């Protein structure tokens, strides 16, 4: 499965996605700014291995680390928080954790073509 890492405002992946749909090529689009608001992430780490699953909160799409055959990264941006009721220091921590996850996430995919 192709993992497309981008942002919601980037329209350039859309024609590619249209072709992927026509050709029945499985893909998952990850809009990085929405990481903290639109996705559920499950991550498991042990001494022997690691794995993750990312799902749209609406349940429409999901991807597992075991499913990824290649990655296309195009214009990702830092995660944004939509949790307005958080204290500023907590909001800062949440954003740092989201950004840290994206960095480790990329590193965990070095075994597949980019």
Residue spans of the language-model regions?
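Conserved N-proximal alpha/beta basic substrate-recognition cap immediately N-terminal to
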Residues: 7-19, 30-114
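Short phosphate-binding/catalytic loops that engage adenosine nucleotides
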Residues: 25
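Extreme N-terminal starter segment of soluble prokaryotic enzymes
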Residues: 1-3
């Amino acid at each position: 499965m192709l993992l497309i890492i981008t942002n919601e405002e980037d329209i350039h992946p859309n024609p590619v996605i249209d072709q992927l749909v026509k050709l029945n090529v499985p893909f998952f689009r990850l809009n990085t700014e929405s990481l903290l608001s639109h996705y559920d992430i499950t991550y498991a780490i042990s001494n022997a291995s690691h794995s993750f699953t990312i799902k749209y909160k609406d349940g429409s799409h999901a991807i597992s680390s075991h499913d990824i055959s290649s990655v296309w990264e195009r214009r990702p941006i830092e995660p944004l928080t939509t949790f307005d009721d958080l204290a500023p220091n907590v909001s800062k921590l949440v954003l740092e954790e989201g950004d840290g996850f994206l960095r480790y996430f990329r590193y965990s995919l070095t075994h597949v073509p980019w």
